[in-house]
């Protein structure tokens, strides 16, 4: 899953692709490198980020989705809003990637069920501006699994089909470096829940390095490690190095 942030303030690439032409060009580069899914987001979820308006989010993502809809690659919409998810699916997206797991918008789960779209539910403890203060756990693996089980139940009760549900333990969201590594060390326990597992760890601070770009080698090494664990996918900034790992 290749990341396409059409935002000015995402942690790793904010501002690089926040115009229509730059976003579409980068998406086509990822397609040429063999990306399976392009995850398009118009609202940063980095720690400390403020929400943007619905209109701003739609203005950022819908034209890009419409342009890429016929490129032969699956598109996911990275959003916490049911209205944005509905508009994106209508514009040609295929998957809803909701970092809040349906908690930010009470209409999201029923909307995903109605649209019959694959839905990614992530472990989430609150808005981005508050997440650093929420990284407190008794046992991070057990706590995150317990939370995901609750979101799985809520999603299924809302009408989302079992085969449409994907889970994400939320690496870097209300978690410190130790928490992130604990989850990675026990990722098979998440796979054992019986749903596809997505991991989004690309270029995040816990990997070390002074800058996001400086964490790329560590990101690829982590993908190599995860490639044998049975996870469904990795969400990454650079497609080719990660594809090469899976090809070996």
Label each residue range with its predicted role.
Residues 1, 35, 74, 94, ...:
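Hydrophobic "anchor" residues on beta-strands that sit immediately upstream
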Residues 39-41, 74-75:
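Short, conserved structural micro-motifs that define repeat-unit consensus positions
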Residues 32, 73, 151-164:
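Phosphate/pyrophosphate-binding loops at sites that engage ATP/ADP/AMP, CoA/4′-phosphopantetheine
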Residues 5-9:
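Short polar catalytic/cofactor-binding loops
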Residues 12-21, 25-26, 45-67, 71-74, ...:
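Active-site-adjacent loop and "lid" segments of alpha/beta metabolic enzymes
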Residues 1-2, 29-40:
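N-terminal glycine-rich anion-binding loops that anchor highly charged ligand groups
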């Amino acid at each position: 899953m290749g990341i396409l942030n059409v935002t000015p303030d995402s942690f790793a690439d904010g501002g690089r692709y926040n115009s229509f032409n730059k976003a579409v060009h980068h998406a086509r580069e990822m397609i040429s490198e063999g990306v399976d899914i392009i995850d398009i987001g118009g609202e940063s979820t980095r720690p400390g980020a403020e929400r943007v308006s619905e209109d701003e989010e739609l203005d950022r993502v819908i034209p890009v989705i419409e342009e890429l809809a016929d490129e032969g690659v699956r598109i996911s919409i990275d959003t916490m809003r049911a209205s944005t998810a509905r508009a994106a699916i209508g514009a040609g997206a295929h998957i809803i990637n909701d970092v809040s797991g349906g908690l930010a918008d009470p209409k999201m789960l029923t909307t995903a069920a109605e649209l019959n779209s694959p839905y990614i539910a992530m472990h989430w403890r609150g808005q981005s501006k508050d997440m650093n203060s929420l990284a407190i756990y008794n046992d991070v693996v057990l706590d995150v699994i317990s939370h995901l089980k609750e979101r799985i139940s809520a999603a299924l009760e809302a009408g989302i089909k079992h085969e449409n549900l994907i889970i994400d333990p939320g690496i870097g969201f209300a978690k410190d470096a130790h928490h992130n590594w604990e989850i990675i060390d026990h990722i098979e326990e998440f796979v054992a829940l019986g749903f596809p597992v997505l991991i989004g760890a690309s270029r995040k601070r816990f990997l070390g390095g002074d800058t996001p770009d400086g964490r790329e080698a560590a990101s690829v090494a982590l993908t190599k490690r995860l490639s044998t664990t049975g996870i469904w996918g990795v969400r990454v900034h650079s497609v080719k190095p990660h594809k090469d790992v899976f090809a070996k």
